[in-house]
């Protein structure tokens, strides 16, 4: 009969050789003879675990321990339990192993590793150290000691431990990988890359080391090599969604959008429940301006991971770009609820609420953003925007000043400050000029102006190429005033090239485009490239139609891409740029004595600097409301921010002096309940009951114009009146009462009224303003007659004489051309002679 030891020896030999079937037969043969044979039970248990039956294998191993409780059996059972995910039970077996055999180095090492997994790094470190004490060349124990030290934050000691592991086993790939991890934690990316490369060389089929190497290469800026490494990772693990997310992220950041999209899409297919795959795809689609699909993907990501604040913030950005402002606000608020310290979400939420004219709601988020970082210039800017809409012009100005102090490099901050200074009721215009010049000095310092050829060779009668730079070639005051003029410019004298700075287009854009010989958007071009484009187009006169308003490109003008540069119509104060030669106005907005407000030289058109294009809607003037209502209706259609405290006080005096009179206010801000309440409270503080106010929000353009039929007389605010609204009011037969001013912006209403022959509707001061309003209200016959005559009067005035205006504008361009090119003072046109 075969001896027991022979059967066991043969079975073990088969087991070690991988012949598991033969080994199993041998163990079972032995157990048939000796059912409680501890080695047979134990090794059959190990084999059964290897064969994918862990529960049956663990049961056999427990029987072996019952038969013979050796330290080795406890250690091996611990390994089996750990592989099964039963960490606490495994730790108990390792502890029993070292209790039974205190000098059992392998059991101490395994216990240390398991304790680290159980987040007990101190205990882990002790047992790993004990294993090393028992076996000083134990590389695996050094590696596990390094892991414990890393978890304890002792990174320098961890580096030493991994180094010892590698010293004792130079082919220990895991130790190199772990060393790379701790070096990455220390931001020693060069050394980390070296360690990961060693790990990859030793274990070239291990995806983990490729992933870590790719991340370290990205961290130190080796993008191309990182992408190549991550491609190798995907080759090794094509079904690993995380690998594809990592590669997609690297490709996205490298600007390889199509390749990135392919990786994120494949990751989402492999693992549909991976939020980061959907979020990564959303982000790259958003960068490709596929915003609608990007929003769908980000929504899916948030369904899978609803606690991810940054994803809500980005989805808010997407909804904003899609014009879905309510949804955008909801997303930003969700982001701030998840993380009250998300300054970007607070800031962006405030900006969208402002676009919805919800200044009161915006105030909370603007203040929250600033509280999180009072040195964040954009947060100061946004709070300034909110306060301005709420009518707090001093608070608005203070925050704009602070924003510029914090970030002098941001031109938008300068724009806000200069605009606020120009329209503030009590700011000296020399301060506005200084702020504008501060901006000019900054942008001109970064520009290298183009040199232009000797002007003596330029002919005075050649066809001029005129460039028009604007973000407002839409239904906007600029577009409205420009439309009629372009149609009447002499195309034999002028060639027109548009340089839009905004992607926005509408019906007005469609009517404007045919008047241009070329349409060259500047949206994606930095200032220098935009200037080179204009220079390459051979522009003779470059016209700025924005000044310090939204989407301006004053930085382009600093490069002096055209020999003659002029600012017109879009703004009402100095740009601050010496590179802009002229500011175009008229004798009303640029009266003698106010030239010092500008860095640019004033150039005055003979009649008006504005040319009004009547609305295309076929609307009648309508009867005088006073006749039908029996009470006077004053009106103001414009931004509430123009209604400063002095304006509210004066208008309240008018209402108090005209019994039964009402004030019809129409503004986008009045779509909000809080704005309605706040406006009523402002008048109540001046003794005017809310019943005397009619307040309406935004309307479609035709409905907006129709609303003028409900007004007897418009009241223009001061010092920031309306230009477009004044002209529109006159066209609808409604006279406008204006206030004489002392700077360009305050003269705009004056210019319209003077040109329309309504100089007697300009008040000298507040008392005269009230007196004129009261007198007009007391003379319905005059109002009625004026109402039915105003449209014809306006249309017959130079304000609506587009051919006349176009000729003056052409002459101005030629006059500027001759003036700046020194072609001879005797060739200057008469219009230019009016400047001082």
Model-predicted regions and their roles:
Residues 1-630, 649, 681-688, 699-713, ...:
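Alpha-helical solenoid repeat scaffolds of the TPR/TPR-like class and their adjacent stem/linker regions
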Residues 466-468, 634, 663:
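Conserved hydrophobic helix-helix packing surfaces used for dimerization/oligomerization
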Residues 469, 637-638, 666, 696:
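Short hydrophobic "strand-cap" motifs at the C-terminus of beta-strands
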Residues 493-495, 652-681:
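A conserved nucleotide-sugar
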Residues 715, 729:
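Donor-sugar nucleotide-binding helix/loop cap in glycosyltransferases
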Residues 717-719:
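A short structural motif in glycosyltransferase catalytic domains
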Residues 730-731, 754:
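Short alpha-helix at the nucleotide-sugar/activated-sugar donor binding site of glycosyltransferases
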Residues 746-757, 762:
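Short acidic/histidine- and often glycine-rich active-site loop of Leloir-type glycosyltransferases
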């Amino acid at each position: 009969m075969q001896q027991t030891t022979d059967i066991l020896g043969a079975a073990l030999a088969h087991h070690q050789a991988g012949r598991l079937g033969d080994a199993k037969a041998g163990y079972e043969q032995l157990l048939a003879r000796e059912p409680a044979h501890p080695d047979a039970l134990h090794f059959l248990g190990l084999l059964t675990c290897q064969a994918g039956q862990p529960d049956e294998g663990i049961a056999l191993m427990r029987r072996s321990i019952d038969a013979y409780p050796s330290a080795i059996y406890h250690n091996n059972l611990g390994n089996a339990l750990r592989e099964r995910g039963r960490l606490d039970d495994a730790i108990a077996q390792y502890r029993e192993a070292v209790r039974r055999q205190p000098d059992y180095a392998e059991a101490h090492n395994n216990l240390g590793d398991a304790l680290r997994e159980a987040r007990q790094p101190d205990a882990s470190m002790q047992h790993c150290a004990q294993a090393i004490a028992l076996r000083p060349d134990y590389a695996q124990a050094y590696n596990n000691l390094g892991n414990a030290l890393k978890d304890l934050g002792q990174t320098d000691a961890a580096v030493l431990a991994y180094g010892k592991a590698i010293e004792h086993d130079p082919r220990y790939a895991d130790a190199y990988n772990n060393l790379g991890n701790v070096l990455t934690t220390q931001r020693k990316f060069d050394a980390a890359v070296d360690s990961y490369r060693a790990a990859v060389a030793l274990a070239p089929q291990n995806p983990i080391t490729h992933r870590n190497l790719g991340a370290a290469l990205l961290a130190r800026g080796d993008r191309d090599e990182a992408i190549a490494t991550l491609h190798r990772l995907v080759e090794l693990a094509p079904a690993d969604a995380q690998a594809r997310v990592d590669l997609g992220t690297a490709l996205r950041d490298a600007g390889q959008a199509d390749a990135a999209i392919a990786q994120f899409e494949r990751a989402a297919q492999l693992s549909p429940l991976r939020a980061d795959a959907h979020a990564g795809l959303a982000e790259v689609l958003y960068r490709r301006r596929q915003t609608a699909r990007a929003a769908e993907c980000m929504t899916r990501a948030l369904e899978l991971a609803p606690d991810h604040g940054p994803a809500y913030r980005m989805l808010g950005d997407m909804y904003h770009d899609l014009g879905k402002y309510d949804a955008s606000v909801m997303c930003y608020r969700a982001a701030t609820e998840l993380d009250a310290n998300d300054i970007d979400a607070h800031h962006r939420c405030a900006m969208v609420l402002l676009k919805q004219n919800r200044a009161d709601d915006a105030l909370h988020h603007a203040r929250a953003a600033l509280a999180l970082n009072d040195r964040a210039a954009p947060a100061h800017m946004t709070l300034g925007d909110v306060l301005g809409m709420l009518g707090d012009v001093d608070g608005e100005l203070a925050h704009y000043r602070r924003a510029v102090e914090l970030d002098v490099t941001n031109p938008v901050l300068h724009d806000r400050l200069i605009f606020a200074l120009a329209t503030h009721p009590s700011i000296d215009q020399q301060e506005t000029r200084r702020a504008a010049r501060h901006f000019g000095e900054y942008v001109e310092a970064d520009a290298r102006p183009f040199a232009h050829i000797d002007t003596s060779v330029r002919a005075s009668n050649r066809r001029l190429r005129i460039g028009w730079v604007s973000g407002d070639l839409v239904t906007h005051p600029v577009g409205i005033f420009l439309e009629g003029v372009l149609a009447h410019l002499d195309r034999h004298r002028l060639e027109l090239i548009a340089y839009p700075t905004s992607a926005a287009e509408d019906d007005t854009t469609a009517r404007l485009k045919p008047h241009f010989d070329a349409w060259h958007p500047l949206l994606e071009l930095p200032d220098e490239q935009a200037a080179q484009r204009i220079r390459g187009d051979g522009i003779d006169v470059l016209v700025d139609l924005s000044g310090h308003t939204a989407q301006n490109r004053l930085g382009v003008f600093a490069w002096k891409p055209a020999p003659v540069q002029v600012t017109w119509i879009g703004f009402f104060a100095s740009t601050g740029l010496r590179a802009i030669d002229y500011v175009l106005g008229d004798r009303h907005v640029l009266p003698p004595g106010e030239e010092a407000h500008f860095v640019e030289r004033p150039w005055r058109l003979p009649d008006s600097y504005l040319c009004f294009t009547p609305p295309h809607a076929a609307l009648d003037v309508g009867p005088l409301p006073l006749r039908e209502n029996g009470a006077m209706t004053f009106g103001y259609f414009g931004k509430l921010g123009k209604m400063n405290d002095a304006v509210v006080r004066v208008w309240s005096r008018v209402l108090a002096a005209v019994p039964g009179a009402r004030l019809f206010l129409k503004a986008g801000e009045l779509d909000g309940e809080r704005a309605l309440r706040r406006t009523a409270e402002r008048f109540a503080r001046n003794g005017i009951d809310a019943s005397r106010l009619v307040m309406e929000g935004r309307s479609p353009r035709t409905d907006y114009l129709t609303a003028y039929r409900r007004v007897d007389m418009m009241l223009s605010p001061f010092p920031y009146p309306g230009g477009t609204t004044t002209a529109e009011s006159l066209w609808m037969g409604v006279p406008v009462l204006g206030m004489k001013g002392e700077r360009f912006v305050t003269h705009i209403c004056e210019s319209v009224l003077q040109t329309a022959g309504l100089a007697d509707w300009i008040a000298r001061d507040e008392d005269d303003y009230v007196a004129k309003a009261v007198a007009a209200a007391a003379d319905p016959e005059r109002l009625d007659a004026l109402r039915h005559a105003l449209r014809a009067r306006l249309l017959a005035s130079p304000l609506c004489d587009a051919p006349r205006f176009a000729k003056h504008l052409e002459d101005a361009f030629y006059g500027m051309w001759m003036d700046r090119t020194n072609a001879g003072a005797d060739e200057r046109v008469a219009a230019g002679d009016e400047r001082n």
